[in-house]
UniProtKB/Swiss-Prot annotation:
PANTHER family: CALCITONIN GENE-RELATED PEPTIDE 2, CALCITONIN-RELATED. The gene is CALCA. It is found in: Secreted. This is Calcitonin gene-related peptide 1. InterPro entries: Calcitonin-like, Calcitonin/adrenomedullin, Calcitonin_CS, Calcitonin_gene-rel_peptide, Calcitonin_peptide-like.
Amino acid sequence: SCNTATCVTHRLAGLLSRSGGVVKSNFVPTNVGSQAF
């Protein structure tokens, strides 16, 4: 249901942050968003 890259990225970021927060330190949505999009 979610095909756009931004939507998928935000969904993955939300799942990862809820699941543990370990990846959160290595994956910063704002930096990735500004560079990739």
